[in-house]
Amino acid sequence: MVQRWLYSTNAKDIAVLYFMLAIFSGMAGTAMSLIIRLELAAPGSQYLHGNSQLFNGAPTSAYISLMRTALVLWIINRYLKHMTNSVGANFTGTMACHKTPMISVGGVKCYMVRLTNFLQVFIRITISSYHLDMVKQVWLFYVEVIRLWFIVLDSTGSVKKMKDTNNTKGNTKSEGSTERGNSGVDRGMVVPNTQMKMRFLNQVRYYSVNNNLKMGKDTNIELSKDTSTSDLLEFEKLVMDNMNEENMNNNLLSIMKNVDMLMLAYNRIKSKPGNMTPGTTLETLDGMNMMYLNKLSNELGTGKFKFKPMRMVNIPKPKGGMRPLSVGNPRDKIVQEVMRMILDTIFDKKMSTHSHGFRKNMSCQTAIWEVRNMFGGSNWFIEVDLKKCFDTISHDLIIKELKRYISDKGFIDLVYKLLRAGYIDEKGTYHKPMLGLPQGSLISPILCNIVMTLVDNWLEDYINLYNKGKVKKQHPTYKKLSRMIAKAKMFSTRLKLHKERAKGPTFIYNDPNFKRMKYVRYADDILIGVLGSKNDCKMIKRDLNNFLNSLGLTMNEEKTLITCATETPARFLGYNISITPLKRMPTVTKTIRGKTIRSRNTTRPIINAPIRDIINKLATNGYCKHNKNGRMGVPTRVGRWTYEEPRTIINNYKALGRGILNYYKLATNYKRLRERIYYVLYYSCVLTLASKYRLKTMSKTIKKFGYNLNIIENDKLIANFPRNTFDNIKKIENHGMFMYMSEAKVTDPFEYIDSIKYMLPTAKANFNKPCSICNSTIDVEMHHVKQLHRGMLKATKDYITGRMITMNRKQIPLCKQCHIKTHKNKFKNMGPGM
């Protein structure tokens, strides 16, 4: 029975074993508790004496607790051989124990990998011990245990086929099913039964760190000769090392050339429509295969990889002028994505909490929310705008900042190659820039953030110097009336004085001895809130301009504005931000130092959506118009959509409305904006449908489709535009709603590692699937489409495209021959029987 419990991977057997252990632990704990209670009742007389008393020997130091934890873990690692993720187990972390060392996946040694996610717990203990400045030997021992755990947990399984020679049912296939829900690769684990016969178990993760595994005589294991992938061990180590912000990073190029990292990067960018747009060559992500990734890995390892020049196009700015945009080679973006992941891992924790642009779990909304929470009480705003920030950043400054934390010359050279790759303009002329970041590169935003972190550090130091005073000084009139109230004996006199005092200010509005400064940055847009005088704002603007000039950046004097917070709203990230005037602030009764006073309560900033500007933007794009009599936002038809299906027309309008309202759901005037947006988009949709069906009037259209614009197909409602379409987009009222509904969530490094590892099996499976048409496994590559339109399903005659729309897949594996035939429309008008 004991052997059954120890060797079984059945959930019930393991549950019984754990239940017995729990009972034993409870009995032992009860006995120890009884002894301690007896000692406490009559100390120093019965069981243990003096300093040897049991309750005195309990560990009271964090150091002793950590050392004992290490001792227990060492004993487990030394004497307990086990496997993880058992078949039929209730949850990940249930382990089956084994005595024979030959079955250990580590070969010679077997280490504890996971027990109720204990790896994360132990790493956190390690970090705690680091901050507690533990003994050096204990710290080194912890690091070694962590390293050995990583080897077992994270190394790629190099086993391709495992077969039980005693199995009479035939060979066990290693190819995985390609059905949805399966990662595409069936993993296996060697688990012995009581007779020590090896079995192959499907869908159990197998970790291998050594090709020279010690196995039983009857075990037949074919090892893969491909050792080019090492899973994500090095990247995970990079994540853990950079929890220390002063860490110097090396061997980054070895992470870059890892095929698994390249595969993961491809998987992250493959569905973006822009990656089907060619750059200066005709190559896109269409036709991607493992051969190209292996070639890319070799070029990165040997230093032969070069970024191709980008294609430069000019797009108009909303307020006039043209913005240059670089269109890069889609296949170069695979390398850029790996670089972005590495740079993000190294530098994100070093950036300011006031920086919200192009960062994980940061967005425009988190920046606006910080303004809402932190800028109350400001009486001046400084809207800082940098002139062509991306185009004027010095390459030498970028490299200098990278070298502060990166010592890998190969990686630095790769960044330098990207910066100097150049571009080809619309006339076909090649340019090699000496300044600036290519707008369109995946790593340009984070490189900009790295440089702008210098500005963040300067502003934070400046704030510490500028802020002064603890509390505002009370207004003389307020103090005078307070003394009169204290001396007044008649109730009517007191009431009269109270009313007179409430009309005036409580504190000196511009107290020279009380100053405050706040700031928020999103990329190159900075908003500074100042509690002080206008001269202070001019001084801040001048000093900031001087510092920007020292970095080679230029402040746009025309767009950098100093505005009175209570009179003129500041425009930041599309919101109008203002402060409630002092006279309109609500009054509240407070007790300060035993005295009851009535003061005006400072309110949060008013964050309004610029409804007039939004309507003007809709008018520019043809959704509404302005009448000659001055009426704004009169809905009109959208002629370019009259050729679409009615379902597509309605869904386009709803998507536009959701996009606007989701962005402005922090606005104080959100409900008014929602009603206005619904009015314009709904009646514009009605007029567009009227134009499509030549119904001439809105009343005839509503009579045909109903007030909710119900589109029915085969007695099934497929689209509508009801009155409550946008009611599910709620205005964010408080911080709890914001944390729940927005992107402002703290990223745990362990969760980040797990999320990346979760994506890797799926990415690998895509390249291991056979051709979706002929089921061939030779020369399989990925067929890409730029967009999938559900409305095209009936109109398309291409069976392959129709199936991709039905499956909602932008990529499918095809062999070389079928891929060529697909692009030549050879499968047109064919059906499932092809």
Swiss-Prot record:
Q: What is the superkingdom listed in this entry's lineage?
A: Eukaryota
Q: Where in the cell is it found?
A: Mitochondrion
**Major place of localization?**
mitochondrion
Q: Which GO terms describe its cellular component?
A: mitochondrion
In what residue span(s) does the Reverse transcriptase domain sit?
296-577
Q: Per the UniProt entry, what are the Gene Ontology biological process annotations, in alphabetical order?
A: homing of group II introns; mRNA processing; RNA-templated DNA biosynthetic process
Fetch the InterPro entries from UniProt: Cyt_c_oxase-like_su1_sf, DNA/RNA_pol_sf, Domain_X, HNH_nuc, RT_dom
Keyword list, A-Z: Mitochondrion
Here the segments flagged for biased composition (Polar residues) are 167-181
Q: Where do the record's region annotations for Disordered lie?
A: 162-188
PROSITE patterns attached here? RT_POL (PS50878)
Molecular function in Gene Ontology: RNA-directed DNA polymerase activity
Q: Pfam families per the record?
A: Intron_maturas2, RVT_1
Q: What else is known?
A: This protein is coded in group-II intron 1 of OXI3 (COX1).
What protein is this chain from? Putative COX1/OXI3 intron 1 protein
Q: Which organism is the protein's source?
A: Saccharomyces cerevisiae (strain ATCC 204508 / S288c) (Baker's yeast)
